[in-house]
């Protein structure tokens, strides 16, 4: 590390240890249109019809494995629950702006809690066959006024490895639908232009239980807990996280300003609240729950994921609250972070302290105005009114029901 960078970091470190408690209690409203969008109330701007499906598509999966409720893909479950009691729900499909199919394609977990996406395409096809056979609404647009929550690693490509996900592409039957997904990366086959990118699920009540007094100084400069190498799937570290996590470890494992480890302590949430910067590098996918945790706990997210599309980017000013570091620049991470002026850091912290910012990243029970549920509805409302071109002529078809891998065509 350069001497200048080291001295700058130490000065920052000491400054924040002494003064961050006083500064962090201040908040700053998001300026301009972004702040207005974040605080929009979607009620009255759209009506959603929720299809009633057999429980094998949703509730029975959850009964079989309740772990799905706490998994980072749980948005598919909580969005269903939210819509059932939301004032935007209509029981008259003829007046609906949007149609929602409540299925839980990621609620199929291994004994270690990892999702198995391999049955998801068949489940999705089965549900679409069901709604297209029993209601007329799918057939009139072939899904263009329907939305699906697909929170898996690579969304509706339904594979956890990027190479395989790219090979598969988005499920053909979803080509016209709006996808609500955690995956977001520019110019990627698994992100449709009209998709709504959302945060992964992080348990609000669990995080709430770990809040510490706001006057505790932020005495950690850079914080990260997680894998640097996926020893089972990529022991050399060149493919996992495109080598970015391995580069963090190799360059900064002995740097006293970097509190990084594979250990996951019981004080993880408390530690994030004591840190100035929290690393949010890509893993197998560009996103992770660390992004949510950093925002909720007021730790400036350091986003290391080239071309990432972040949640609710039209409402949350990510450039103002976070720090973006190119994957190739990871070896310069210490210099980059220690070069950020103090006043810039303080402003980012004030923005992060805004309650509306935190609410937008969470799926609380019960729902709250401005939370992630409402941001999704805002995204759907901004797509209205639908263009007349989405409606097909009698007998017209746009989708190929026989396209896709042979395994996907088997009954579910």
UniProtKB/Swiss-Prot annotation:
Coiled coil: none annotated. Residues 22-412 are lumenal. GO terms for molecular function: 1,4-beta-D-xylan synthase activity; glucuronoxylan glucuronosyltransferase activity. Keywords: Cell wall biogenesis/degradation, Glycoprotein, Glycosyltransferase, Golgi apparatus, Membrane, Signal-anchor, Transferase, Transmembrane, Transmembrane helix. Limited to xylem cells. Expressed in the root tip, xylem cells of roots, and in the vasculature of roots, cotyledons and leaves. It is an enzyme of class 2 (transferase). GO terms for biological process: cell wall organization; glucuronoxylan biosynthetic process; plant-type secondary cell wall biogenesis; protein glycosylation. InterPro entries: Exostosin, Exostosin_GT47. Disruption phenotype: Moderate IRX phenotype. Slight reduction of secondary wall thickness and xylan content in cell wall. Specific loss of the GlcUA side chain in xylans. Slightly short inflorescence and reduced fertility. It is a single-pass type II membrane protein. It is found in: Golgi apparatus membrane. Glycans are attached at residues 139, 400. The chain crosses the membrane at residues 1-21. It comes from the Eukaryota. GO terms for cellular component: Golgi membrane. Its EC number is 2.4.2.-. It holds the Pfam family Exostosin_GT47. Belongs to the glycosyltransferase 47 family. PANTHER family: BETA-1,4-XYLOSYLTRANSFERASE IRX10-RELATED, EXOSTOSIN HEPARAN SULFATE GLYCOSYLTRANSFERASE -RELATED. Involved in the synthesis of the hemicellulose glucuronoxylan, a major component of secondary cell walls. Probably involved in the elongation of glucuronoxylan xylosyl backbone, especially in the formation of GlcUA side chain of xylans. This is Probable beta-1,4-xylosyltransferase IRX10. It comes from Arabidopsis thaliana.
């Amino acid at each position: 590390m350069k001497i200048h960078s080291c001295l700058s970091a130490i000065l920052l470190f000491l400054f924040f240890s002494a003064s961050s408690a006083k500064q962090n209690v201040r908040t700053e409203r998001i300026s301009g249109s972004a702040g207005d969008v974040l605080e929009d109330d979607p009620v009255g701007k759209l009506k959603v019809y929720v299809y009633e499906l057999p429980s094998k598509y949703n509730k029975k999966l959850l009964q079989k494995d309740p772990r799905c409720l706490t998994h980072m893909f749980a948005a598919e479950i909580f969005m269903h629950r939210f819509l059932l009691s939301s004032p935007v729900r209509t029981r008259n499909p003829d007046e609906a702006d949007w149609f929602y199919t409540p299925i839980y394609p990621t609620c199929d977990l291994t004994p270690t809690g990892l999702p198995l996406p391999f049955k998801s395409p068949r489940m999705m096809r089965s549900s679409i066959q069901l709604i297209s056979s029993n209601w007329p609404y799918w057939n009139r647009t072939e899904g263009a006024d329907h939305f699906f929550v697909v929170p898996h690693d690579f969304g509706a490509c339904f594979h956890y490895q990027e190479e395989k996900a790219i090979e598969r592409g988005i499920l053909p039957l979803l080509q016209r639908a709006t996808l609500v997904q955690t995956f977001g990366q520019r110019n990627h086959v698994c992100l449709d232009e009209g998709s709504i990118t959302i945060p992964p699920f992080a348990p609000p009540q669990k995080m709430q239980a770990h809040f510490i007094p706001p006057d505790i100084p932020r005495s950690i400069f850079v914080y990260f807990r997680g894998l640097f190498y996926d020893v089972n799937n990529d022991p050399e570290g060149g493919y996992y996280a495109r080598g970015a996590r391995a580069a963090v470890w190799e360059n900064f494992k002995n740097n006293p300003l970097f509190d990084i480890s594979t250990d996951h302590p019981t004080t993880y949430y408390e530690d994030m609240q004591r840190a100035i910067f929290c690393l949010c590098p890509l893993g197998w996918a560009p996103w992770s729950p660390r992004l949510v945790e950093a925002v909720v706990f007021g730790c400036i997210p350091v986003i290391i994921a080239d071309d990432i599309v972040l949640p609710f980017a039209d409402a949350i000013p990510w450039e103002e609250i976070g720090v973006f570091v190119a994957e190739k620049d990871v070896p310069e991470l210490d210099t980059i972070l220690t070069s950020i002026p103090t006043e810039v850091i303080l402003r980012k912290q004030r923005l992060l302290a805004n309650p509306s910012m935190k609410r937008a990243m969470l799926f609380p029970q019960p729902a709250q105005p401005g939370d992630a549920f409402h941001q999704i509805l805002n995204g759907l409302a901004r797509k209205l009114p639908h263009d007349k071109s989405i409606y097909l002529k009698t007998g017209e078809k746009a989708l190929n029901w026989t396209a896709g891998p042979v395994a996907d065509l088997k009954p579910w």
